[in-house]
């Protein structure tokens, strides 16, 4: 499938196709009047978010969460969180816990007036086994004793039909006996599988007698060693939906070819009287393809294992634990999802749309502060050594009710190294000998020169305060200047580690085609500096977010930031530095 670049506006233009489907079902009463097994009326729509607990959720999952929980809320329904935990080899409670935390962090709940709607496919193992026997008894499933390699080879391809298994015509009695012996643990892994009997010449290869159960002697994180056979996803998923009274099973496009199998399983069980109508229906929407990122679990695991990142929660990672640590807010992710909308066709969404959503959200909520990230000392020569002038600035320029923050102006300050030059280029309005600038929230100063070490490196800048020019006083505008620089008092500044994060890759599609995604790693995706911060930041708590004026938005690291030893991460810059 071709993937064209798309803006958020373009993607959002088709964002209502799922709503149209739901509206039609509501108008036609498709799921009206339903009750659960306890006789309680069921809501008009029920959706679900069904992750497999074999890894950490990423930004693509956030879109699925937003779609499923958001539509359920919009229509007065409910959304279930269900773990599709049918592969004991790859799944772990660590991932279960992280997924629960991530969904909660995004602001969603699977609880409502009828209780807790957190489910595990493994809780249905006994029922799933019973449904498999129903299919066997109907002649719709059989035990195949071919090896996995033989099954794959005999499935055919898009140009030739599959070859029926030599075991396809086993009797119902033999199939039942073998299946029960499989459950009893009489066979080794791979010795037998249960397959659906559909059509080995079907144009859709998924329908060529897919495997429904396999033998897997492995410890399960919930059921322990109670089972040695496990159902496949395609068999489990649709039945779990039906058991939970799901109405709209919303999946991403890679499951489109699996929809006929979804319907085949449910239709057979309905016709056998094992499941009541109306049955759930599957609908597909485009998954999120974000530029300058990868979401493949295998490739993300490679980054972690090769220590190219600092773990799954590295702020450069697209995992939800990573972007949370980066400082993204749940509201910004929801805003991003709203802007890109829901489409039927795959497309690439530019990272700048996500970053703009984060920027817009933090602009409205983040208190302002000052940080000097590449410091050089500025000495005000015409004031005494004990000079200490109180200055103030609004906590947020658009929210005066938040008050003002106080900080001192002293004789020695820290300023950004880039705010001084001896030989200014055209259009440079900051400090150079003879030039005047305003110290933000303070006085106008005139630069008089600088000090250098033996190697010619600038070690200090010198200037004089121009009296009666303090910001907010009657004489503030008596001296006109074009430059305005930020600063912190050298005596009062808070020293802190600041981690300057950027995009992990330099290529917008780092793993497309035959590219080696490792070749596109951005060497400047993380820089660590020792910075000097406004003293008001001493009280910052983990996950407190701020705008560092002139620099961007920053967050106190949720893991490493400690009282008296703060660590800040750059969330996003004030402007898009990657735009063409």
Swiss-Prot record:
A motif ('HIGH' region) lies at residues 51-61. It catalyses: tRNA(Gln) + L-glutamine + ATP = L-glutaminyl-tRNA(Gln) + AMP + diphosphate. Keywords: Aminoacyl-tRNA synthetase, ATP-binding, Cytoplasm, Ligase, Nucleotide-binding, Protein biosynthesis. GO terms for cellular component: cytosol. GO terms for biological process: glutaminyl-tRNA aminoacylation; glutamyl-tRNA aminoacylation. HAMAP family: Gln_tRNA_synth. This is Glutamine--tRNA ligase. It comes from Ralstonia nicotianae (strain ATCC BAA-1114 / GMI1000) (Ralstonia solanacearum). The lineage of its organism: Bacteria, Pseudomonadati, Pseudomonadota, Betaproteobacteria, Burkholderiales. The gene is glnS.
